[in-house]
């Protein structure tokens, strides 16, 4: 008898995330950068999944900024990403008060109170995944390396906190002047 596995697929502006559930438990997850080649990356991710679970049956739902068109073409259910996040958090971490989600090009805050309230940044991508990637590149590391660098900091430098472009123009001269990473 084939096992029914449930796939959640988030096709974002910079990455593809996939989670596979069996009987409500996560049995597989993956986070892959698509480097603006969404279709080929999606095919690669799904092909590797089919190789890993060749005898199983799947249900699938899509979310994310890059998923709506794909869901229409493939006739696969699409769930708006704030709703997907809200549903997962309410089920898996029901005592949560606030969720902060940093996407590749946006940032969202979801407040869980009597009513769900959601806010999203405007047109600026400062503080998003793309901004963090740019800062990591500027510092010759990756986003995990930013975590490690932050653990050993000795000085806090004044950097614009409201705009990614201004932050970058604050960081570059500091590095040129020999500021420690």
Protein language model features and the residues they cover:
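Adenine-nucleotide phosphate-binding core of ATP-dependent small-molecule kinases
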Residues: 167-181
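Glycine-rich phosphate-binding loop plus the immediately following alpha-helix
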Residues: 114-155, 163
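A short acidic Gly-Thr/Ser loop motif
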Residues: 10-14, 65, 102-106, 128
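Short glycine-aspartate micro-motif
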Residues: 4-10, 59-61, 95-100
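Active-site cofactor/substrate anionic-group-binding motifs, chiefly glycine-
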Residues: 81-100
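Short beta-strand-loop/turn "lid" adjacent to the catalytic site in phosphate-handling enzymes
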Residues: 22, 31-34, 52-83, 110-119
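Short glycine-rich, Thr/Ser-proximal phosphate-binding strand/loop in the N-terminal lobe
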Residues: 3-40, 44-47, 122
């Amino acid at each position: 008898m084939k096992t029914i596995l449930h796939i959640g697929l988030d096709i974002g502006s910079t990455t593809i995330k996939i989670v596979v559930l069996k009987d409500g438990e996560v049995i597989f997850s993956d986070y892959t950068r698509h480097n603006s080649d969404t279709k080929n990356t999606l095919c690669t991710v799904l092909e590797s999944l089919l190789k890993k679970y060749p005898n199983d049956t799947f249900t699938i739902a899509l979310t994310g900024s890059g998923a709506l068109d794909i869901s229409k073409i493939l006739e696969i259910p699409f769930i708006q990403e704030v709703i997907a996040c809200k549903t997962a958090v309410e089920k898996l971490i029901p005592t949560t008060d606030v969720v902060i989600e940093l996407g590749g090009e946006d940032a969202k805050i979801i407040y869980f109170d009597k009513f769900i309230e959601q806010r999203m940044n405007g047109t600026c991508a400062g503080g998003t995944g793309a901004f963090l990637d740019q800062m990591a590149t500027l510092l010759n590391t990756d986003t995990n390396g930013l975590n490690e660098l932050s653990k050993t900091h000795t000085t806090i430098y004044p950097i614009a906190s409201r705009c990614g472009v201004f932050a970058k123009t604050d960081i570059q001269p500091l590095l040129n002047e020999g500021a420690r990473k």
